[in-house]
Design a protein with these regions (language model features):
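Membrane-embedded alpha-helical bundles of multi-pass transporters/translocases
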Residues: 1-352
Length: 352
């Protein structure tokens, strides 16, 4: 594998690794404070909605479509052309997200005033009301991260997710214990921390964008051929990712029918799976997308083939043993990480 790619993957992997490590600390604290309670399960279900938009309009489908076109524009038209494209896409994305948040609040008010909803739905909606604007921030963060990655600036985008975990952990330690005696009151502090972290993540990106010469401005010229290309390329990716993410949402909702504990238990297990995935596959994919886009813009398909082959061998070398280890050692790993004696995550939670 190209040394520059490997070095960049290590930078992204290091930032992702730190984020995943802090994310694991965050989940340990969540298990310590909330266990597999209804409050924790309601939070996990409510947090799915901003994450769904992040996957579709942020680091998922939009980034997969935007980064290649943005990289090509950089190669051919320089920063001026890239700024114009980023301004048009950013304006379109911000408009969609703002309208989505408004519609979301209208739907929540309609549901609560029209239907008789139970304790679980009430708990989910109370948290979603707080966290819904997070999708606006995090999708714009993902767009700015895509621009920086296209300029081969990987450090700040890789470290930006760390801020979410830092704010989240800080809230668990210093804010949530003082919000009341019930878990429902304490979990509201986590929801507010998530929203605050989204704003912080966006603000951190701005100075780096300006330093790199990226100064996109609002533009409603969405008839641009490159904007249309981004949207056309986004369609298949959004369809594929959308189906997967909707399945994730359905999984968590169906888990509620198993028991109040089930969505929380499912989320704790997913955190362990995503740890090696984020360290290797996600980090490498983040670096490879702008690299492949640059090769394609320069009409160098042989470099794409060589790099892809090396990347696949590297991923398999790491992920196959990690997968086997998680399967064979599932119970002792969960028990070691999450089971803190005397708190809400007990032996039954481990089995769940």
């Amino acid at each position: 594998m190209n040394r520059n790619i490997f070095r960049a993957a290590n930078v992204v992997g290091g930032g992702t690794g730190l984020s995943r490590l802090l994310g694991l600390v965050r989940e340990i604290l969540m298990a310590w404070m909330f266990g597999t309670s209804l409050a924790k399960s309601a939070f996990d279900v409510a947090f799915l909605i901003p994450n769904l938009f992040r996957r579709l309009f942020g680091e998922g489908a939009l980034s997969a479509a935007f980064v290649p076109v943005f990289t090509e524009t950089l190669e051919h038209d320089g920063l001026d052309g890239a700024n114009r494209l980023a301004g048009k896409i950013g304006t379109l994305l911000a408009t969609i997200l703002f309208l989505s948040v408004c519609v979301g609040y209208v739907v929540m008010v309609f549901v609560q005033n029209t239907f008789e909803i139970g304790e679980k739905a009430t708990a989910v909606l109370s948290l979603l009301r707080v966290m819904l604007p997070y999708l606006f921030f995090i999708c714009l963060v993902a767009l700015s991260m895509g621009m920086l990655n296209s300029l081969r600036h990987f450090a700040i985008p890789a470290l930006t997710p760390v801020l979410l975990n830092v704010v989240w952990i800080s809230a668990l330690i210093w804010i949530c214990p003082h919000l009341g005696d019930t878990l429902e009151q304490k979990i509201q502090g986590v929801a507010m921390a998530v929203l605050f972290a989204g704003g912080v993540q966006l603000l951190v990106q701005l100075p780096v964008l300006l330093k790199k010469g990226l100064r996109p401005t609002f533009s409603f010229d969405w008839q641009d051929s490159r904007v249309r290309r981004v949207l056309l390329m986004m369609g298949p990716a959004a369809l594929g990712m959308g189906i997967f993410q909707i399945n994730v949402v359905i999984d968590k909702i169906l888990a509620f029918y198993v028991g109040d504990w089930a969505p929380a238990a499912l989320n704790y297990a997913e955190r362990l799976i995503y740890l090696p995935l984020g360290l290797v596959a996600t980090a490498l994919g983040t670096v490879l997308l702008p690299t492949f886009s640059s090769y394609a813009a320069r009409n160098e398909p042989h470099l794409i083939r060589e790099t892809l082959g090396s990347a696949l061998r590297y991923v398999l070398f790491i992920m196959v043993p990690a997968t086997v280890g998680l399967i064979v050692l599932a119970q002792p790993i969960v028990d070691l990480i999450y089971h803190l004696p005397g708190k809400r995550f007990d032996a039954l939670s481990t089995l769940q």
